Amino acid sequence: MTQSYVNKEEIISLAKNAALELEEAHVEEFVTSMNNVIALMQEVVAIDISDIILEATVHHFVGPEDLREDMVTSDFTREEFLANVPVSLGGLVKVPTVIK
């Protein structure tokens, strides 16, 4: 049997905290699935990677040498820009309210 990392009560609490509706019939499925995922992650963490050269795996990140210098240009006037927005107010772009 797989080691138990989480139990039924923890799954119910997790679903509640995440504002998810979880039917009682599916709770045991989630307990089993979550325990399987955690067990798999335990196996991944246990893999010995000491012989891997870590420096060779970080070259895909963007560094300062990959960025262009910021240069101010005046391709558009304010009027040209505002002509393309749905709603403007006092020379500014009016956007919908996000926070109530």
UniProtKB/Swiss-Prot annotation:
Q: Which UniProt keywords apply?
A: ATP-binding, Ligase, Nucleotide-binding, Protein biosynthesis
| GO terms under biological process | regulation of translational fidelity; translation
Q: Classify the source by domain of life.
A: Bacteria
Catalytic activities: L-glutamyl-tRNA(Gln) + L-glutamine + ATP + H2O = L-glutaminyl-tRNA(Gln) + L-glutamate + ADP + phosphate + H(+); L-aspartyl-tRNA(Asn) + L-glutamine + ATP + H2O = L-asparaginyl-tRNA(Asn) + L-glutamate + ADP + phosphate + 2 H(+)
Q: Give the enzyme's main class according to its UniProt record, as a single word.
A: ligase
Keyword Ligase applies: yes
Q: What Gene Ontology terms describe what this protein does at the molecular function level?
A: asparaginyl-tRNA synthase (glutamine-hydrolyzing) activity; ATP binding; glutaminyl-tRNA synthase (glutamine-hydrolyzing) activity
Give a yes or no for keyword Protein biosynthesis in this entry.
Answer: yes
Covalent S-S links between cysteines:
none
Q: What is its EC number?
A: 6.3.5.-
Indicate the family of this protein.
Answer: Belongs to the GatC family.
Reported function: Allows the formation of correctly charged Asn-tRNA(Asn) or Gln-tRNA(Gln) through the transamidation of misacylated Asp-tRNA(Asn) or Glu-tRNA(Gln) in organisms which lack either or both of asparaginyl-tRNA or glutaminyl-tRNA synthetases. The reaction takes place in the presence of glutamine and ATP through an activated phospho-Asp-tRNA(Asn) or phospho-Glu-tRNA(Gln).
Record note on quaternary structure: Heterotrimer of A, B and C subunits.
Please identify the protein, giving its name as recorded. Answer: Glutamyl-tRNA(Gln) amidotransferase subunit C
In its UniProt entry, the species of origin is given as Chlamydia muridarum (strain MoPn / Nigg)
